[in-house]
């Protein structure tokens, strides 16, 4: 089988899902036990949205498959255990939306039976069979059956609202202790009934496709739920860069490059002779400092010593 297609009927005002996750039971082989239940999942991606069910689907499906194959050629392989864990986690988050998609009918290409019996979801198994309505295939459905893909017609049901949320009164605005009057802009009836305005209650049809189903025909569907594209992202573990022992960081406080010469000797010498010129004038203090430098023979101040000798001794 080349592809399987889901045609979802929804209201124009509702948001379509980027992808759907379909879960079904795989046909057992002769070597497998009869009591063993093999459940498989398949991702269906959104190809396009059409306004009528009479639109031919073959061209949209083929174009979407070709585009998807081109994208896969440029994308690395995503088959990893971490991806499977992400899919399972997202499946649990989307369990509340399982009942939103109801399967109406299933059609196989080149089949003797134009319409396969209505397939219900797992939640509809308790409903008596006489309550399940069987729909006859339309002309558009018969036209699409001739294509090389299996077609499922579904309806996106809106969630039931048990408790309607009442609009609360807006906060009162005061100006100088006087209540302000709110004015609302009203839309004229002519604007509401304009031809270019779309009716949100009209129905459109979302076409989803899957080109990688390798287990024969899809049957015994358990559920259909939204699938998040972000689940395919594989988060690679961050590996720290290799650090060699002979490398060091210049910004570290204890790095040998940040060692500065000690100034304790100069500060001790100044503290030792500060008493000689603490209470005297600046000239006497400078002279005491120069005598101290002569005594200890500091080579760093040779220029100052020579100037001092010329001033004192000529």
Curated annotation (Swiss-Prot):
It is found in: Cytoplasm; Nucleus. One of its GO terms (cellular component) is nucleus. The keyword Protein transport applies. Keywords: Cytoplasm, Nucleus, Protein transport, Transport. Directs RNA polymerase II nuclear import. Belongs to the IWR1/SLC7A6OS family. This is Probable RNA polymerase II nuclear localization protein SLC7A6OS. The gene is slc7a6os.
């Amino acid at each position: 089988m080349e592809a399987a297609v889901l045609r979802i009927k929804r209201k124009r005002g509702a948001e379509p899902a980027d992808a759907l996750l379909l879960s079904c039971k795989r046909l057992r082989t002769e070597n497998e036990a009869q009591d063993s239940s093999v459940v498989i999942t398949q991702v269906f991606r959104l190809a396009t949205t059409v306004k009528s069910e009479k639109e031919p689907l073959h061209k949209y499906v083929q174009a979407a498959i070709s585009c998807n194959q081109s994208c896969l050629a440029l994308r690395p392989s995503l088959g990893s255990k971490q991806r499977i864990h992400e899919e399972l986690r997202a499946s649990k988050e989307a369990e509340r939306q399982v009942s939103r998609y109801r399967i109406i009918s299933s059609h196989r290409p080149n089949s003797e039976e134009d319409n396969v019996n209505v397939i219900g979801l797992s939640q509809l198994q308790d409903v008596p069979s006489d309550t399940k309505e069987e729909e006859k295939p339309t002309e558009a459905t018969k036209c699409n059956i001739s294509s090389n893909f299996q077609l499922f017609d579904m309806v996106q049901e809106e969630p039931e609202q048990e408790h309607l949320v009442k609009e609360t009164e807006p906060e009162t605005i005061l100006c100088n202790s006087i209540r302000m009057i709110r004015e609302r802009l009203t839309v004229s009836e002519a604007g509401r009934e304009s031809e270019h305005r779309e009716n949100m209650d009209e129905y459109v049809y979302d076409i989803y496709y899957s080109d990688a189903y390798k287990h024969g025909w899809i049957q015994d569907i358990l559920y259909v739920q939204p699938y998040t594209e972000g689940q395919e992202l594989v988060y690679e573990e961050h590996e720290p860069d290799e650090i060699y022992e002979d490398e060091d960081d210049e910004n570290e406080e204890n790095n040998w490059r940040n060692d500065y010469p000690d100034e304790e000797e100069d500060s001790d010498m100044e503290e030792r002779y500060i008493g000689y010129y603490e209470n005297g004038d600046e000239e006497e203090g400078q002279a005491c400092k120069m005598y101290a430098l002569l005594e200890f023979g500091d080579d760093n101040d040779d220029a100052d010593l020579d100037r001092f000798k010329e001033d004192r001794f000529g």
